[in-house]
A protein has these predicted regions:
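Iron-associated oxidoreductase/ferritin-like identity signal
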Residues: 1-158
Length: 158
């Protein structure tokens, strides 16, 4: 099915963002694991896996619309050298993704592409949930201090 070029461009831009997030979150997860923060590392890896599912959905949709997926990581992952910095970077990125995907919904609506619009709307809900989690973590750090927060990240389990 031939798709609208502007929609395919939005899908590819989102794919680039998702691929960047996957690399960023997987690396941050391993950093947290290496620092001994298993719980936070596991949670970060879970976010990376969700972003992989987003990338898969975007690739499927682009191909369905007879487009060619751009599978290059076009953006540079921002890792952060400390846990709080990682959380702040990730919150900004998730907030940016929500804004980007809301703009994409408008493009899809103008093109009367409800399938792509629905995909973006679903991704928005996931990114909002991620942003809410990250905001809560930063709030916890502010309330209890970084040392107390990190001590809670030492154990495994979710």
């Amino acid at each position: 099915m031939r798709g609208d070029q502007k929609v395919i461009e939005q899908l590819n831009a989102a794919l680039s963002s998702e691929l960047t997030a996957i690399v960023q979150y997987m690396t941050q997860s391993e950093m947290c694991q290496n620092w001994g923060y298993k719980r936070l590392g596991d949670l970060t890896k879970g976010r990376a896996i969700e972003e992989m599912r987003h990338a898969e959905g975007l690739i499927e949709r682009i191909i369905f619309l007879d487009g060619i997926p751009n599978i290059e990581v076009g953006l540079k992952p921002q890792l952060g050298s400390k846990v709080q910095e990682q959380l702040e970077i990730d919150l900004k990125d998730e907030t940016d993704a929500v804004r980007q995907y809301n703009d994409a919904v408008k493009v899809c609506a103008e093109a009367k592409d409800d399938g792509s619009k629905s995909l973006f709307e679903s991704m928005i809900r996931d990114e909002e949930r991620h942003a809410d989690f990250l905001d809560a973590q930063l709030h916890a750090i502010k309330e209890m201090g970084i040392a107390n927060y990190l001590s809670q990240q030492l154990t495994g389990g979710k």
